[in-house]
Amino acid sequence: MRKAILESYLTEQEEGEHQVLVAENEQACLGYITLVKCPKKGRFSQTGIPEIVDFTVFEHFQGQGIGYRLLDAICQLVSDFTSQIGIGVGLNAHYGKAQKLYVQNGFIPDGTGVWYEDSPLAIEASAYNDDNLSVFYQATGNMISCCIEMLIEKIRSSR
């Protein structure tokens, strides 16, 4: 399943629909981040806001600043053509580090509440707490610049 998703990212990147940035060293892929410039489904599909749709630092490489660098790189890329960027993040404990990362780097909840499978979850509705249960964050204008500056400072201080 994961291989098919990654192959679809490559095809979409070749067609200009997706941007994929990869962090790697001489031996391995450390992580990656993907951006859809014009989402066709989900929260940002009607807004024109580009969306980070997949962001992974493989567990063995976490805690080394790789996630900060990938987020910085995608923020810089986005700032060349828009002043906004969005991301959805899961609500279960598996996503705890990611939730903190986005808030620490200038992303704020977008105020649309909880979503499940690309749709807002109605009040009192039930949902399965899986990877499809999410909340969306957004960085806008100065927040992207602030995000970049904060990331640069964190990278410098981690050396």
Predicted feature locations:
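Conserved acetyl-CoA-binding loop-helix of GNAT-fold acetyltransferases
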Residues: V57, G63-Q76, K100-Q104
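Conserved catalytic-core motifs of GNAT/GCN5-like acyltransferases
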Residues: G88-G90, G106-S126
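Short amphipathic alpha-helix that is part of the acyltransferase structural core
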Residues: M1-A4, E24, C29, K154-S158
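Conserved beta-strand in the GNAT
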Residues: V22, A28-P39, E51-T56
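Conserved acetyl-CoA binding element of GNAT-fold acetyltransferases
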Residues: S45-E59, I87-G88
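Short hydrophobic/aromatic beta-strand or adjacent loop that forms the aromatic wall/cage
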Residues: H18, D131-Y137
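Conserved GNAT acetyl-CoA-binding A-motif
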Residues: V78-L91
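Active-site rim helix/loop that mediates acceptor-substrate recognition in acyltransferases
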Residues: M1-V20, K41
